[in-house]
């Protein structure tokens, strides 16, 4: 398996930096992508970075990742709480899955406390802002290094 990692972003994350900055901060998704690519290069990971407001596109990328990727770092956003379909897709992926949330979902509305994705995730990172993506990439890289021996 290669050092390829998919970084997948769910609905409304295209508005990062503009939507509720008091919760999600002022960094844009382009900033997150830039930082993920820079860290990926440092760690020897190839990054495929995607965002969609459509559930089926996220599922298609998960299916694509099955063939070549070592890991998925995913911020499913609102699909976290609703999507059995994304859970089912992730259950077909054999690599590492890290679930990321920019805000601490457990300090927010009750409905945000439930995650279908967590049922498959190898780890969950929440409340560290966009740094959570970088923590997720570091974890995938560490697991890859450990698997190499």
Swiss-Prot record:
EC numbers for this chain: 4.2.1.10
HAMAP family per the UniProt record, alphabetical: AroQ
Write out the catalytic residues in the record: 24, 101
Q: In which pathway does it act?
A: Metabolic intermediate biosynthesis; chorismate biosynthesis; chorismate from D-erythrose 4-phosphate and phosphoenolpyruvate: step 3/7
Record-given protein name: 3-dehydroquinate dehydratase 2
Q: Which UniProt keywords apply?
A: Amino-acid biosynthesis, Aromatic amino acid biosynthesis, Lyase
Encoding gene per record:
aroQ2
Q: Which reaction does it catalyse?
A: 3-dehydroquinate = 3-dehydroshikimate + H2O
Q: Which Gene3D superfamilies does the record associate with it? A: Dehydroquinase, class II
- Residues that, per the record, bind substrate: 75, 81, 88, 102-103, 112
- Task performed by this protein: Catalyzes a trans-dehydration via an enolate intermediate.
The site annotation (Transition state stabilizer) covers: 19
Which family does the record assign? Belongs to the type-II 3-dehydroquinase family.
Under the heading PROSITE patterns, the entry gives: DEHYDROQUINASE_II (PS01029)
**CDD domains per the record?**
DHQase_II
Organism domain of life: Bacteria
Assembly description: Homododecamer.
Q: What class of enzyme is it?
A: lyase
